[in-house]
Amino acid sequence: PDGVELVYSVAGQGEPALVFIHGGLAERSFYDGQLAEFAPRHKVIALDLPGHGESGSDRTKWGIPEFGADVMAVVDAEKVGQLILFGNSLGGPVAVEAALLMPGRALGIVGIDTFQGVDYTISLEEVRERAEFFEKDYAGALKEMIGLLFHKDADPAIVADAEKRMSGTPPEAAKAMFLGMAGYDLGAAVRRLTVPLRAINGDLYPTDVEANRKLKPDFEAVIMEHIGHYPMIERPEEFNRLVAETVDALVR
């Protein structure tokens, strides 16, 4: 929307389109297994948010609403009518913002290890601390963060692969992204939603379903046992089955 280059992968045909949004510091290749799995039945899109993967980083506003507009720009470029939005981590709030920009087009939002508690505002102090941590020692901060996103006995090859893919995010983009989240009120955005909100979450951090239902009475979550922050790369077959079930339920 602001002229920044957006790079995305697209496969298949058929609506609703499935649109996959990665988390902070990640990139679209985290969803390669979903493009392959769902392309026979749906148009599947996975994009790199600005500052991530192959997308550009020439922008001044880095908020979650701006990322939501980026998602809509890609969806519009692909002439998609109806769609379901999937968002991992930061991609969850981004999916909410994208849905709010596209009334009547989104059939639902599915968080992927996100929305553990939707009544949440990100404080400036919290993001400033995180931004400074990454600015000082990006590689060290990334390693420490990834250590908190997997179970201790997770497959070391999968953990190393995630770290390698995330190490390509420029530190300046990481800092801008963290600072751009300050003051974002997820609860207020969720209250405005008129489409179903779902989550496929790991069990590393608890999901407060009852608290979420106070804001969004139709909220539902499926918890994958002994899975961390990236179920799509940790147990792709099980994850894909849950995605298919969720899509079927939202389309019915």
What are these regions (language model features)?
Residues 17, 41-43, 79-84, 105-108, ...:
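Structural signature of beta-strand start/N-cap positions in the alpha/beta core
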Residues 36, 46-90, 241:
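Active-site loop/oxyanion-hole signature of alpha/beta-hydrolase fold enzymes
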Residues 233-248:
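Post-His helix in hydrolase/transferase enzymes
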Residues 30-32, 55-61, 121-122, 210-211:
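Conserved catalytic-core motifs of eukaryotic protein kinase domains, centered on the activation segment
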Residues 4-57:
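Conserved HGGG/HGGXW glycine-rich cap/lid loop of the alpha/beta-hydrolase fold
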Residues 119-125, 133-192:
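Conserved alpha/beta-hydrolase catalytic His-Asp/Glu region
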Residues 80-120:
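Conserved hydrolase catalytic core segment
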Residues 196-233:
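Conserved loop-alpha-helix segment in the C-terminal half of the alpha/beta-hydrolase fold
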